[in-house]
Amino acid sequence: MEQQLWRQGCSFVVGVDEAGRGPLAGPVVAAAAVLPRDGTGLPSIIRLDDSKKMTEEEREAAFEALEAASRDFERTGVAFAFCVLPPSLVDEVNILEATMLAMDRAVQELSEKLRGGGQGGTEGSSPGALPLAVLVDGNRLPPRLLAAQQQQQQQQTSESSKFLARAVVKGDAKITAIAAASVVAKVTRDRLMRAAAEKWPRYGFDTHKGYGTTAHVAAIRKYGPCEIHRRSFEPIKSLVGWTRGEMGSEE
């Protein structure tokens, strides 16, 4: 699919994915990534795949290689951006809306980087203004991307402003750029959860990364939720009697 889009005139094929929709604690992270057409800018990456199929060591190695390559975008054609949204926002708007917002923001930041040759660009500019294709893992597009796609379809625009946004089910196993975004999102979030484990060691965030394991749920029941637990997720919701609009404070 990526090769076909390049042949159709897209300058960049952006892959988008998220990490952290299901956990009981921690942020949701979305990432957007672009890779070179021929892969020559990624000599040290042996494997890019759906991050869930990779070991932690493989993900870290891939992330380090992506990060190193992105420092010389003009030579490598590698760039990425990510957005981290806190659990308080997840509780405020719900996890789906938070995920969509994070994806929109990651794409926005990356599009600004691409305008600036990988170093940043015009703040607030629309992702639809670049000749690019945005491929999102899953079955729906974030609102801003959907609006840009609809606007593109309604207007008879020139080739230079070509824009396409598409949701791709299981895209992290089909599209290399989505796989790269998957790695960036997962590694970024895992690192944040390991840091959280140092602040709240009794929950074991460094091992389960906030997911609802038996040990994690037992710790929540024993100690109560901490600052980064999602009050809108069960069993925390029932434990604290949370309802949307009542953002509880730490005791």
Question: Model-found features: residue ranges?
Answer:
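RNase H-like, Mg2+-dependent phosphodiesterase core
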Residues: 1-251
